[in-house]
Amino acid sequence: MAKVTREEVEHIANLARLQITEDETTEMQNTLESILNFANQIDTADTSEIEPTYHVLDLQNVLREDKAIEGIPQELALKNAKVTEDGQFKVPSIMNEEDA
């Protein structure tokens, strides 16, 4: 059984820059002990007959197959553009010439 001291709780609170009351220190002490005991339970669980996994759920790739498809015609893509040049969208520059 894990035992957390008041000094450890106060040190953790200090590291987190928290000011906690005596009641909060006691509550946090009990909470941390509970968490550490649960972690110890998990650590000591017999998993010798359990197959290792990388994911909790047995998921397969659910994405569709990647297939090239015909895009929209250039004229249609540029139809509502305010300014075009050489078959491309023309937008205001966001960099100075010196930045390029």
Curated annotation (Swiss-Prot):
**Enzyme class (EC, first level):** ligase
Task: Fetch the InterPro entries from UniProt.
Answer: Asp/Glu-ADT_sf_sub_c, GatC
Entries under Gene3D superfamilies matching the protein: Glu-tRNAGln amidotransferase C subunit, N-terminal domain
The record's EC number reads 6.3.5.-
A GO term for molecular function? glutaminyl-tRNA synthase (glutamine-hydrolyzing) activity
Q: Which UniProt keywords apply?
A: ATP-binding, Ligase, Nucleotide-binding, Protein biosynthesis
Tell me the domain of life.
Answer: Bacteria
SUPFAM superfamilies recorded: Glu-tRNAGln amidotransferase C subunit
Do the record's keywords include Nucleotide-binding?
Answer: yes
Provide the GO biological process annotations.
glutaminyl-tRNAGln biosynthesis via transamidation; regulation of translational fidelity; translation
Pfam families listed in its UniProt record: GatC (PF02686)
Q: Which reaction does it catalyse?
A: L-glutamyl-tRNA(Gln) + L-glutamine + ATP + H2O = L-glutaminyl-tRNA(Gln) + L-glutamate + ADP + phosphate + H(+); L-aspartyl-tRNA(Asn) + L-glutamine + ATP + H2O = L-asparaginyl-tRNA(Asn) + L-glutamate + ADP + phosphate + 2 H(+)
Subunit structure comment from the entry: Heterotrimer of A, B and C subunits.
Q: Hey, which family's this protein in?
A: Belongs to the GatC family.
Q: What biological function has been recorded for the protein in this entry?
A: Allows the formation of correctly charged Asn-tRNA(Asn) or Gln-tRNA(Gln) through the transamidation of misacylated Asp-tRNA(Asn) or Glu-tRNA(Gln) in organisms which lack either or both of asparaginyl-tRNA or glutaminyl-tRNA synthetases. The reaction takes place in the presence of glutamine and ATP through an activated phospho-Asp-tRNA(Asn) or phospho-Glu-tRNA(Gln).
Put simply, this protein is called Aspartyl/glutamyl-tRNA(Asn/Gln) amidotransferase subunit C
- Whichever gene encodes this chain, its name is gatC
